[in-house]
């Protein structure tokens, strides 16, 4: 029985090591109008006293206070996110067709201040030009927070992977503890960007300019489709939240 329990724990751990939740957006429902909104973050900094969110209105809050900010927003229903595997983001497209994509969208029922903070951090890591020193300090702070729930585990793993990916592709860090957390597809793409190997260009089916790399999935096209991630996510949200009513409580 003990061996079986350990096996189940290992399987659960493996699942959270290969899955990420990306493109976490706020769901806003006012009357019958449903929309997806980006987080109001313009920067994050890390100090001895915690992780700090710099907001669009010029204020700065401790990341653990972000839950209060979100819950005060009119019509806030929670977050929507996309579950992906390492191999599915090529930095050019998301390797999911529209049918598969719809099955990966989730309504994120987050409860704790830590979970709200992690949702904000995923957005920041995907979208904001963060300093190298901030990335170095961030994970050291995050490991101090207990990952007690499945959603906390997958959010932490997502942040960890994004931090290592940013350190590798933007700051040219190649330490083994960084590289083994960077998805192989992204490592290959970064190699193509630097060396222009024709075989890799054929594999990725692209001859585009490689000067700009963006970790945000919002504008990624889906596989075999002209639809972008944000378009299909918005369609899903409008359908789901219209049928399910208020999900904020």
From Swiss-Prot:
Disulfide bonds: none annotated. Signal peptide: none annotated. It is found in: Virion; Virion tegument; Host cytoplasm; Host Golgi apparatus. Its main location: virion. It comes from the Viruses. HAMAP family: HSV_CEP1. Belongs to the herpesviridae cytoplasmic envelopment protein 1 family. This is Cytoplasmic envelopment protein 1. It comes from Human herpesvirus 6A (strain Uganda-1102).
